[in-house]
Structures are given as structure tokens and as C-alpha cells.
A protein has these predicted regions:
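An acidic/histidine-cluster motif and surrounding catalytic segment
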Residues: 1-89, 93-207
């Protein structure tokens, strides 16, 4: 089965898009650019200002709010198109043959191993701290396609970034509801999502 891939990218950033397109074409990976909300575009000022009025919006920069909005629009797109599982990448992520093989061997039987209330991180946790503070279980793991995802069992609150993750549409719908009920939050407020029982467990493999 084909696993849909969203790449969040500013429409005006042509040079970066061209580089991404070259890499994915070379690896023969299908993907779709998803136009990110541009915080520098005056047309987005109204929606950004509105998001600032709830939750922790007042503490966030325009760029952080725009990032949150971009990911939430992807969640809505997953729901609208009935996409069960999708990979969401930001345009600074580095992909390689390991990522290609993960996609190549991902099929229906692999999908059945995934749980809707778990978040599967495809990397992006290296270089965030001075030392490896995320502890991963040696025993609680799941082999999906060619990759082994291990449960994060220590310092879950240190998980950051939204650069590469695999998510189910049920979780996407719950995150949109969280915005409606709680208000604005950062796109990578994984701790908050865990506290609201939207994410049960985090599984990580640096793909």
C-alpha cells in the first residue's frame, strides 16, 4: 500500500522545494507538498491574531502559530480525504535509503501492527540536548516494515519537533478537537497531547 507523505513547505521557498523534489525523485518516493501558513504574508495576520487569543497563543511567536496552523490543516486534510495513516515531514528533514525501504515494504499487514493512539516518531530527536535524555525500552518495541520502533519510557516530556512523524486520522481528529476545547498550543506540544490522553505512547526510530 502507498503511505501518503505530506511535506510542509512555504510556497514561496522555491529553492528549498526544488532541492526536496530532486532528492525524492532520486529515491523514487511519491509525496505531496503542503503549503504552510506563511507568517510573513499579511493575508494570514487575521487568523494568526485569532489563534493568539486562546490557549498559550499569547506566548507564541507568529512563526510558531503559523507552524501549528500548518500541521492542523494537514490533520483536517487527512480527515477530509479519509487518509488512515500518513507521514508528515517538514522541509528541513533529511531522507535516505532507509526511509525509502521503510515505505517500500510498508503494507497492509504492517499497518495492522500500528495503534491509533500511539505516535510514531521517524527521527528528529538527535541534537536537541547535550546528552541522550530519551530512554527507549529494550523490550517494548514493534517492527514496522524495515524499522524497529521502541517505546520511549523515560523523559517523554523532552520529545520535541514536528519534523517527521507517522500519525493516524483518529489522532488527527482528536488534536483538532483539543484546539477547539483547549485553545492554541504549539505543534510539538506532545506532552500536552499525552496529558490529554490523545497520545498513549511514543515510539521512536531514527530513520
Amino acid at each position: 500500500m502507498n503511505l501518503p507523505i505530506y511535506i510542509v513547505s512555504l510556497k514561496r521557498d522555491i529553492e528549498r522545494r526544488n532541492k526536496i523534489n530532486d532528492v525524492f525523485q532520486r529515491l523514487n518516493i511519491n509525496f505531496d507538498f503542503f503549503d504552510a501558513i506563511d507568517a510573513k504574508d499579511p493575508q494570514n495576520k487575521e487568523i494568526i491574531d485569532k489563534m493568539r487569543l486562546s490557549g498559550v497563543g499569547a506566548e507564541m511567536t507568529d512563526g510558531e502559530i503559523a507552524c501549528t496552523l500548518s500541521h492542523q490543516l494537514i490533520y483536517q486534510d487527512m480527515i477530509d480525504k479519509n487518509i488512515e495513516w500518513a507521514v508528515i515531514l517538514e522541509d528541513d528533514v533529511i531522507v535516505n535509503e532507509k526511509f525509502k525501504k521503510f515505505l517500500q515494504y510498508f503494507n497492509l499487514s504492517e499497518k495492522d501492527k500500528l495503534k491509533h493512539n500511539n505516535l510514531y516518531l521517524l527521527g528528529g530527536q538527535k541534537g536537541l540536548h547535550d546528552y541522550p535524555v530519551l530512554g527507549q525500552s529494550l523490550f517494548s518495541k514493534v517492527k514496522i516494515s524495515t524499522c524497529t520502533f521502541r517505546r520511549v519510557n523515560f523523559n517523554k516530556n523532552k520529545i520535541r519537533r514536528t519534523c517527521s512523524y507517522l500519525m493516524n486520522k483518529d489522532m488527527a481528529q482528536k488534536l483538532l478537537k483539543l484546539t477547539k476545547d483547549y485553545g492554541t498550543y504549539r505543534a510539538d506540544s506532545w506532552k500536552l497531547m499525552h496529558q490529554h490522553h490523545i497520545i498513549k505512547e511514543f515510539y521512536l526510530d531514527e530513520i
